[in-house]
């Protein structure tokens, strides 16, 4: 029998024994046909390659990520990710869904990047409820029924609305979960700091996976209660990895990325998480297992994730296993990336364009300096105690703090304080909401930052040390049809335009990455000190991430799931 390709003299990663075995690999019709020797009298090919003792492993599989986190479209994401050995992803498009609803999800599905992109149905759009945040659209159980008809929808995306899930049997999220259970698909979770009976109730409803930031304690409790853990960068600590290794928990977790910014994507993707696991003490064999085999099984992608007869021929050739040096990447048995020659461009032939309406979604007039004045109720005279959001350095969580500020003519006098002002403007033309908060911590010491890439509602959020710079940054975002802007001394010093829904761009990823890098550096120059400045700022608006966050409706006490006042009490 003639086969399409034979690669000889390889060190083949065997997922079942978690070790490398010297062998030949035979490929036919996009699948592995035979791994081994002794085939010459029965199988042959006109296309024989000497593997030169290289390592071959399955293509990497990222089962929890958001394409919108890279601020790009699926095609451009595919071109970037495949260079890093990623051949399959499961994307939760809840960012585009918050802006455009089902229409946005279907537009993403329409794009073909030739990387295998499967999708999870956004389960929490909005992430909380319409009483706590304004979004462009909603996803209800009716839309879920429609989306489940798509072949590449394979799971329910992260369930964030914990309060409605456990307190209201008839809530939208419970209806969504019940419909999804009928399809027997994995139900992905989002449950930071949920424990004890609350965690049991969460799992009891059917949600049995979590990707949020973990500790040794949360890993133990969640895994012993049957949860599958998806380890992202924030969870990659020495203590966590040691716990997973010592307890031999390789069947119960996978490595994932969750959010990879565009300036980071040009340098790495899931391969970087894999290498981080190895640096922290995990063997390369087990790190590969957690990036290929376990994620495939978690998502019922049983046709891939291992090098064995009948499985998809998605694989990576490595020069060196020690530094994970990628030489070539193959998709369905076809070489799509070579380190020296680059991408095989014809493999990425899709040229789909988005409808023009996706480029004009900001329904907001330019703001004025007066609109940024924080008016204080008459009952507070000269001084007032205010809540603050304290930014923490190594997490996207915040802590609630308190500061005393002067009041003059019913206007809060914050500019000479230790805090920055943060404001959220509703941008969908629905209610013209404006809310205010105060932020402290290792944040900007001057200037301002503004963005519509504000998770998950993506309203216009601006934070600054003076009203003038805040106005300039916010209006530049509006005039750019969305994006990220940093201003200082009444000038824009860094800008990334995100005209598609205010959250993504169709420019090449290299250009997006360069501009985002300039924004990041500008934030650092202004004093923002965090392991990920972009995500830190952009999640100040995420009302499912502890502890105090802000939306267009006001300050949100995340644990209580309720709006709280900026003002605590007056001091006369």
UniProtKB/Swiss-Prot annotation:
The gene is ade. Transmembrane segments: none annotated. This is Adenine deaminase. It catalyses: adenine + H2O + H(+) = hypoxanthine + NH4(+). Keywords: Hydrolase, Manganese. Gene3D superfamilies: Metal-dependent hydrolases, Urease, subunit C, domain 1. InterPro entries: Adenine_deam, Adenine_deam_C, Amidohydro-rel, Metal-dep_hydrolase_composite, Metal_Hydrolase. It comes from Clostridium perfringens (strain 13 / Type A). GO terms for biological process: adenine catabolic process. CDD domains: AdeC. Disulfide bonds: none annotated. It comes from the Bacteria. Its cofactor is Mn(2+).
């Amino acid at each position: 029998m003639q086969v399409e390709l034979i690669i000889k003299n390889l060190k083949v990663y065997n997922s079942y024994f978690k070790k490398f075995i010297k062998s030949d690999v035979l490929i036919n019709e996009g699948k592995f046909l035979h791994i081994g020797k002794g085939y010459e009298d029965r199988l042959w090919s006109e296309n024989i390659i000497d593997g030169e003792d290289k390592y071959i492993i399955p293509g990497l599989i990222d089962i929890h990520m958001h394409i919108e986190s890279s601020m790009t479209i699926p095609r451009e994401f595919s071109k970037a990710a495949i260079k890093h050995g990623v051949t399959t992803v499961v994307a939760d498009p809840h960012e585009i869904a918050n802006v455009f609803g089902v229409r946005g999800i279907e537009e993403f599905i329409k794009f073909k990047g030739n990387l295998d992109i499967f999708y999870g149905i956004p389960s929490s759009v909005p992430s909380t409820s319409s009483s706590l945040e304004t979004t462009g659209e909603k996803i209800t159980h009716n839309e879920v029924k429609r989306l489940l008809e798509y072949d590449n929808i394979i799971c329910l995306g992260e369930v964030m609305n914990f309060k409605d899930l456990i307190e209201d049997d008839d809530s939208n999220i419970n209806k969504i979960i019940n419909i999804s259970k009928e399809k027997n698909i994995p139900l992905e979770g989002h449950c930071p700091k949920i424990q004890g009976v609350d965690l049991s109730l969460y799992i009891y409803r059917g949600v049995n996976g979590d990707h949020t930031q973990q500790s040794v304690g949360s890993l133990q409790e969640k895994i012993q209660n049957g949860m599958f853990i998806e380890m992202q960068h924030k969870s990659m600590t020495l203590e966590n990895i040691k716990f997973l290794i010592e307890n031999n928990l390789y069947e119960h977790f996978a490595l994932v990325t969750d959010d990879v910014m565009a300036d980071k994507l040009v340098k790495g993707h899931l391969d970087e998480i894999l290498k981080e696991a190895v640096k922290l003490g995990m063997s390369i064999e087990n790190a590969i297992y957690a990036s290929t085999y376990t994620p495939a099984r978690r998502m019922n992608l049983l046709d891939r994730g291992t090098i064995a007869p009948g499985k998809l021929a998605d694989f990576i050739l490595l020069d060196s296993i020690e530094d994970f040096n990628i030489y070539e990447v193959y998709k369905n048995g076809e070489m799509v990336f070579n380190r020296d020659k680059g991408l095989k461009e014809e493999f990425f032939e899709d040229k789909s364009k988005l409808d023009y309406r996706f480029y004009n979604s900001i329904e907001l007039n330019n703001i004025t300096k007066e609109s940024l004045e924080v008016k204080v109720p008459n009952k507070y005279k000269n001084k007032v105690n205010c809540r603050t959001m304290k930014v923490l350095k190594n997490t996207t969580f915040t802590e609630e703090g308190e500061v005393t500020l002067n009041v003059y003519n019913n206007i809060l006098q914050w500019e000479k304080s230790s805090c920055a002002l943060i404001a959220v403007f509703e941008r969908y033309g629905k209610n013209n909401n404006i809310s205010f908060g105060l932020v402290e911590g290792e944040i900007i010491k001057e200037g301002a930052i503004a963005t519509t890439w504000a998770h998950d509602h993506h309203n216009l959020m601006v934070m600054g040390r003076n009203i003038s710079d805040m106005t300039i940054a916010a209006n530049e975002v509006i005039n750019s049809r969305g994006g990220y802007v940093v201003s200082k001394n009444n000038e824009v010093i860094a800008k990334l335009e995100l005209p598609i829904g205010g959250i993504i761009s169709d420019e090449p990823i290299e250009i997006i990455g360069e501009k985002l890098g300039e924004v990041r550096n500008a934030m650092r120059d202004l004093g923002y000190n965090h392991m990920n400045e972009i995500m830190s700022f952009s999640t100040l608006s995420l009302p499912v991430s502890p502890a105090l966050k802000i939306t267009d409706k006001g300050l949100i006490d995340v644990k209580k799931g309720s709006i709280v006042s900026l003002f605590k009490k007056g001091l006369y």
